[in-house]
From Swiss-Prot:
The keyword Cell wall biogenesis/degradation applies. It comes from the Bacteria. This is Undecaprenyl-diphosphatase. The keyword Membrane applies. The chain crosses the membrane at residues 1-21, 39-59, 96-116, 128-148, 155-175, 201-221, 231-251, 259-279. One of its GO terms (cellular component) is plasma membrane. It is an enzyme of class 3 (hydrolase). It is a multi-pass membrane protein. Catalyzes the dephosphorylation of undecaprenyl diphosphate (UPP). Confers resistance to bacitracin. It holds the Pfam family BacA. Keywords: Antibiotic resistance, Cell membrane, Cell shape, Cell wall biogenesis/degradation, Hydrolase, Membrane, Peptidoglycan synthesis, Transmembrane, Transmembrane helix.
Amino acid sequence: MVLEAVLLGIVQGITEFLPISSTAHMYILAKLLNLHVPGRFFLSSVQLGTSFALILYFFKDVKGIISETSRSIYSFIQFGIRQKQGKRNEYTRLGLLLVTGTIPVVLLGFLLVRFVPDGFFSAARNLFTMGVALIVFGLLLGFADALFRRKKGNIFQITFIESVLIGAAQVFAIIPGVSRSGITITTARFLNFDRQLAVRFSFLLSLPVTFIGGMYGLVAGPDTDYYSLGYSLIGAIVSFVVGLLVVSALLRIISKTTFVLFVYYRVLFGLFLVIVSFF
């Protein structure tokens, strides 16, 4: 049990931030190693673990966004004052961009949950669908990364329309194999973000959705999760530590190279799943 929780926590910590789909890997690992498929409570716990890893790594950004956005909104409401461009206003703009990027995925997510039959989500969780999603969206990442050269390297170059598009793209991540970070990074690269800005914005944009989603999963009520509170806590701690290391490593890697290795991995892993699905 402890080993299973640790193993699943490691997989979540690695795959949550890499553009290779954490959901697909968690599901496949459980199936291949004959582990118990994690329930909502465990998945929410390890998701929160990686969320806290992001908060710690980007603590300066998160603190600046909260404090400066609040300060700017208060100043504007009270005095009609707008700040000039600068470090403080960078945090204010980033905060507003994250809000506009979060709104569409929340609305679209609500509509999907409300109107799409539960059978759709169950049907999507199969080897063939995951394999195809890994391949198709992996090729899209490779195409965007190779074709669209870096142009936008700072927050002030991002428009609110672009933040809405990137935020809305997250809805595709309901399909196992797509990858939330993968689709947002891909969209950002199509919009000519440089790699570091694409990854930074993608990670920060994920925080509201993953944190709120993780908290909701914990308080939504008991489920039939095989993993108890203790094992879920172990998984969360492991995913936090591993996630922190992966975020740091990824940001160093993409400053020196492209996403091509992730594209190759997605295509090969996707082909493997498609082939296995026929047996």
